[in-house]
Amino acid sequence: MLAECRPGDPGLPLAITMSATYWRSAAQDAAMQEEHRFVWKAMLDTIDTDLAGTRVLDVGCNRGGFLRLLADDCGIKEGFGYDPATSAIEDARRLAGTRPLRFEVAAAPPSGWNGFDVAFNHEVLYLLDDLPAHATAIFRALKPGGVYYAVMGVHAASPLMATWHAKNAEAMGLPALYELDQVAAWFSDAGFQVAAGRLWIRFVPIAAEHLDEARLLDVLDYYYNQKILLRFSRP
């Protein structure tokens, strides 16, 4: 999955240089996926869906690490991931091995990708300029009864992320920070039933760089209270 964007730690963004072929660079993207594992595990501990035998869509899949985890540990039937970063997708295809995974370079669900049981993203919504269009696209990609789980910590009510966004939005070409209430309303308007919860996070890995920019309690508050798991269910 894309995008919390700080080199060398598990998720607090720092100013970065984005690449057309990778989110950051080959080495940094690989490190980012490893650093996100504790959040991925928390997502899987929190959701209320049995993934065994399901067809899964990963929105902003980067190098495919989350789908490999689902194939190895959750017994999914098929996994499909898309991402605009060309080289990251090439890596995802190579690393998939014989797993039932497919990856495409795209900024939206590719044509013909539909009928999914479950979709996921981790910190992708804040990057998108047109969330109503995204909500509609994912609604169409899911089968009736399908569920879209989206983790969102970069939003207007998160003090750490508001500070980071103010410093980096112009250089990164980011849209204005979204309010969670507005995000929920857009997905509701697209036809979803909306629910929200906090991630079941246990220990948070703390890199030394964290403490150069934020107090430990602020970092914990971000992960425990401000990083929200949104559930969008298609009736």
Named regions from a protein language model:
Residues 1-50, 69, 149-174:
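Conserved class I S-adenosyl-L-methionine
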Residues 63-108:
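Class I SAM-dependent methyltransferase SAM/SAH-binding core
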Residues 120:
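A conserved beta-strand element that flanks and buttresses the S-adenosyl-L-methionine
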Residues 123-127:
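Short catalytic micro-motifs in class I SAM-dependent methyltransferases
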Residues 132-144:
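A short glycine-rich, Lys/Arg-flanked "PGG" loop and its adjoining helix->strand segment in the class I
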Residues 162-163, 195-235:
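A C-terminal cap/extension of S-adenosyl-L-methionine-dependent methyltransferases
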Residues 175-191, 196-197:
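Short alpha-helix
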